[in-house]
């Protein structure tokens, strides 16, 4: 396979090959990092729309957390009622009655 002929003057002038388009060879403009301005009234409504999109349906771990929260609010299974606080108050009342 023959080697390419490269003259030193021609190689230094052209950094990129000819087959590359102007769109690809053009360097992207430098990004200016400006501080975001406070949202106007119109922008706030669009922010609310974005938040509602996130509330459509929980996926993965988020769904598990949501399910646990709802289960805590519901009464116990098989018709049992939650009696976490009432036994403690009954015991305290019995102890006071015994000490009298």
Swiss-Prot record:
Localisation: Nucleus; Cytoplasm
In-chain residues carrying the UniProt-annotated modification N6-acetyllysine: 14, 27, 82
Residue list for modification Phosphoserine: 8, 21, 25, 86, 89, 99
GO cellular component: chromatin; cytoplasm; female germ cell nucleus; nucleoplasm; nucleus
The UniProt record lists the keyword Cell membrane: no
Modified residues (ADP-ribosylserine): 7, 25
Keyword annotations of the record: Acetylation, ADP-ribosylation, Cytoplasm, DNA-binding, Nucleus, Phosphoprotein
One Pfam entry name: HMG14_17
Region (Disordered): 1-100
Phosphoprotein keyword on record: yes
Source species, domain of life: Eukaryota
Subunit and interaction comment: Interacts with transcriptional regulator SEHBP.
PANTHER family, A to Z: NON-HISTONE CHROMOSOMAL PROTEIN HMG-14, NONHISTONE CHROMOSOMAL PROTEIN HMG
Record-stated family: Belongs to the HMGN family.
Role summary: Binds to the inner side of the nucleosomal DNA thus altering the interaction between the DNA and the histone octamer. May be involved in the process which maintains transcribable genes in a unique chromatin conformation. Inhibits the phosphorylation of nucleosomal histones H3 and H2A by RPS6KA5/MSK1 and RPS6KA3/RSK2.
Protein name: Non-histone chromosomal protein HMG-14
Name of the gene: HMGN1
């Amino acid at each position: 396979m023959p080697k390419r002929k490269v003259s030193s003057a021609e190689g230094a002038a052209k950094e990129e090959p000819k087959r590359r388009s102007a769109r690809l060879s053009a360097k992207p403009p430098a990004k200016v990092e400006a501080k975001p301005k406070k949202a106007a009234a119109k922008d706030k409504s669009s922010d609310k729309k974005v938040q509602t999109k996130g509330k459509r349906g929980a996926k993965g771990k988020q769904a598990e957390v949501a399910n646990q929260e709802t289960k805590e609010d519901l009464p116990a299974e098989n018709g049992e009622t939650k009696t976490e606080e009432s036994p403690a108050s009954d015991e305290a009342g019995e102890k006071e009655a015994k000490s009298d």
